[in-house]
Amino acid sequence: MNPSPSIVGLSDIEALERVPLEQRDLPSSTYELLQRSAQRHGQRIALSCLLHGSAAEEPLRISYAELFARVTQTANALHRLGLESHQAVSFLLPNLPQTHYVIWGGEAAGIVNAINPLLEPEQIAELIRASNTRVLVTLAPFPGTDLWQKVAGLRAQLPELYAIVVVDPANLLPAPQREALKAQRGPLPEGVLDFDTLIADCPADRLESGRAIHPDDVASYFHTGGTTGTPKLAPHSHFNEVAMAEIMGLNADYGVDDVLLCGLPLFHVNGVMVTGLAPFHRGAQVLLAGPQGYRNPTLIQDFWKLVERYRVTSFSGVPTIYAALLQVPSDGRDLSSLRFALCGAAPMPVELIRQFEARTGLKVIEGYGLTEGTCGTSCNPRGGERRPGSIGLRLPYCQVKVAVLDGEGNYLRDAAPNEVGNLCLKGPTVFKGYLQQDRNRDIWIGDGWFNTGDLGRIDEDGYIWLTGRSKDLIIRGGHNIDPQMIEEALHRHPAVALAAAVGKPDAKAGELPVAYIQLKPGASASEEELLEHASRHVPERAAVPKDIWLIESMPVTAVGKTFKPALRLDAIRRVLEEESRRIAEDIRVEVVADERHGQLAHLHVPALDERRRAALEELLGGYALNYRLHAV
């Protein structure tokens, strides 16, 4: 595979696009992609897998030939269990080599449905039903994880399953530990199949189904959203995923000497594509850095040792990971192998980029993507000007525009350069709509443009700037406040590790800005000090937070992105508790996400006389909130 020319500006992207994607000899499926890589790079290492995320342990090494053989065996095992091409195999697994076998073998046999193990059991069951799942693959009972307990509690609710298959991490342990653990645990639950035993009996050189996979066949479902109710399922075709791998390879110029560290979960498109299919497409090596990835403190503490030992050339993370790595000394470590680090999922504060690069000498490249676009959409050019705070230039073959909509969400026109509007996507990696048809209202603009719901602008040079998420905007008396400007200012305080700004309800203004702060380990700063800092550094007077609340740890999603819905619920709770306790001291407030109402406040109220109860209801009526009163 010829090396890609370094992308400096938009003209280089346009030069690549002079060769249509259809003329780039793309594989017809992810299975054919892995087959080609096995033919070209058979004995090269595809995966180096760690069980503990430690630099001291010896990895399990898997060649491209072995990877393709295990993927083929997995596809055949699923076929023997009765899985058809239109049916799904769901997985609830940490980052293990078998997870890759299930993903790519599942796509060869049917459709893979990736499920976040941290979801509530009810949401997991809904995703299994919605995806037409017939086989479920999860973790065998194992110390330190409750995955099996979650699945065991759901078995009776899922009679449509043909089989439940378990991956046993004990099989990866040395013989004495393996046998001791299995003896202590006893036999697997009745009716449950062992993954490694199941695939061992299947051929590794052909698909027994004889299936001819077409580029437009659905390969996978990835869930997205779901702060209330069931997450949305985004189908990806084989063409979507192969095109994404090709585009990422062109953009990053992955080659056989690259080593990509994977710390993000394999139920998320970033882990699967950036540190999975894209490097596999080009014969690179993936370091699977432990089952829990970045959630494992050992991986964070050993991160720079791992970079040095494995000669890691790039990795992908989110801002919270970079903030954590800043606390780990890298002095004396040979980091010369690193070409760049990618940051996505949330805007990375400019000050955090500056601190990280000053400490490590490493170039941080911000990008942007989303599940509905298979993964990546834009990236700062690796060979050109990197504009801190920008999510860079669109990736090759990915179309991006900003649309101006009216108050009802109707398309008015395309935005002028630097004019803020809704960011819209089109191209070979964009999905065709959510599996649940009722989720597809108002997501398309014009001729096949997907409305991301993100607000942004594109400057004269093609650089894209996010200005906020439409639902993240703080609306103070009709004035839109971008939370990012507050967060950027707070990150400049030396004690701040993470900052997140949201709106708190206000009877007069609708919302007022507030901020949550997680301090750096060992650092100290009072809320008063941080408020004073904000008043001096937040550039817009109306955006200066009215309150700053210190918290021990920022709520995050499974991939480490700050989970603002939890902060909004907490802000509502704080306001209602403060206000209602002026009427009665022992009122308790609980605010929850509700599928019908969005946010619902439950107030547990002692016996009140008629006057105080009327005063409480008048107070609550001043907020645009749904609430319930409960007598205690």
Where are the model-predicted features located?
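Conserved AMP-binding/adenylate-forming
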Residues: 289, 340-344, 348-367, 371-464, ...
